From Swiss-Prot:
GO biological process: arginine biosynthetic process via ornithine; citrulline biosynthetic process; L-arginine biosynthetic process; urea cycle
Organism from which the protein derives: Gallus gallus
Protein name: Ornithine transcarbamylase, mitochondrial
Species lineage: Eukaryota, Metazoa, Chordata, Craniata, Vertebrata
Residues of the transit peptide: 1-32
Function: Catalyzes the second step of the urea cycle, the condensation of carbamoyl phosphate with L-ornithine to form L-citrulline. The urea cycle ensures the detoxification of ammonia by converting it to urea for excretion.
Gene: OTC
Tagged with keyword Amino-acid biosynthesis: yes
Length: 354
């Protein structure tokens, strides 16, 4: 058959609340994992299975090796266009999308809140329908995740979450690719999150267990992750046999961890809370004292931009810090997402160990 019936059923199930039929069917040769993502949205990693996450990372690794290391030209996006709607400022998400899409032969159009006001000058419904008629995919960075949900119901093309108040899936795919490259695999690693219970953490929580990673989370009281997401994470931990710890003690979270992760304490839109947040997060800076509690092979990740109060220079610029490899991998993982959602591409290189 031209496509896997199981995948067709799953795609139909995911879109059953939409008036639209499944957008595409995979017509290419089956890949080693028998995964088809063409036509899917990417709003949260919660909607992706373990095999689907591994497939995205495999495609990212494949594209990186073929294009960067071997110098191949792969015009997989030739004739395709990407609409980029950004309500918030961005460096890495915008650059990785624009340069990655161009590297694959496609064209991107960048629209800021000065160009388009979601739900203000024009309804989300109308915006999604217009963009669907002119482009092949939408990458949106928004304040409210609900806007993405509505957009996916009205769009007939894939919608990709470039960051919302709830999730940042593209960042976490880059983190996982970076860790896979460094450690040679992900299964069995312990991630320690020390900081705010924010969108980046939520994306880790909804995916780490699927890849066999344990999670230790330290947040100040009042800054815990969303309770709904915590419940899902607890369920995943039981289902996949991983360990989960939630605490207010940074050193307890760091104990035995392979990967130490933090992020900004003051996200975009929270500037008025700066004084209160800086006070609440005292003692949460990652320092060499923190890493003494970690595993001997510890590494450090930060999605950037970084402030010194979040992590000191000694850790941030140490050989154990993978932040700049992590930043580069934003490009390869977003390219993998676009290729997977828009084409029938099958990786040519051997699947990495996960």
């Amino acid at each position: 058959m031209l496509f896997n019936l199981k995948n067709l059923y799953r795609i139909t199930k995911l879109t059953q609340n939409s008036k639209h039929l499944p957008r595409h069917f995979c017509r290419g040769p089956p890949n080693q994992m028998n995964v088809c993502l063409k036509g899917r949205d990417l709003l949260t990693l919660q909607n992706y299975t373990a095999d689907e996450l591994k497939y995205l990372l495999w495609v990212a690794s494949d594209l990186k090796q073929r294009i960067k290391d071997k110098g191949e030209y792969l015009p997989l996006m030739q004739g395709k266009s990407l609409a980029m709607i950004f309500e918030k400022r961005s460096t890495r998400t915008r650059l990785s999308a624009e340069t990655g899409f161009a590297l694959l032969g496609g064209h991107s159009s960048f629209l800021t809140k000065q160009d388009i006001h979601l739900g203000t000058n024009e309804s989300l419904t109308d915006t999604a329908r217009v963009l669907s008629s002119m482009t092949n995919a939408i990458l949106a960075r928004v304040y409210k995740h609900n806007d993405l949900d509505l957009m996916t119901k009205e769009a007939t093309i894939p919608v990709i979450n470039g960051l919302s108040d709830l999730y940042h899936p593209l960042q976490i795919l880059a983190d996982y690719l970076t860790l896979q490259e460094h450690y040679g695999g992900l299964n069995g690693l312990t991630i320690a999150w020390i900081g705010d219970g924010n969108n980046v953490l939520h994306s880790i929580m909804t995916s780490a267990a699927k890849l066999g990673m344990h999670l230790r989370i330290a947040t100040p009281k009042g800054f815990e992750p969303d309770l709904r997401i915590t419940k899902v994470t607890e369920q995943y931990s039981k289902e996949y046999g991983t360990r989960l710890l939630l605490t207010t003690d940074p050193l307890e979270a760091a104990n035995g961890a392979n990967v130490l992760v933090t992020d900004t304490w003051i996200s975009m839109g929270q500037e008025e809370e700066k004084r209160r947040r800086l006070k609440a997060f005292q003692g949460y800076q990652i320092t060499m004292q923190t890493v003494q509690s970690a595993a001997s092979n510890w590494t450090f990740l930060h999605c950037l931009p970084r402030k010194p109060e979040e992590v000191d220079d000694e850790v941030f610029y140490s050989p154990r810090s993978l932040v700049f490899q992590e930043a580069e991998n934003r490009k390869w993982t977003i390219m993998a997402v676009m290729v997977s959602l828009l084409t029938d591409y099958s990786p040519q290189l051997q699947m990495p160990t996960f």
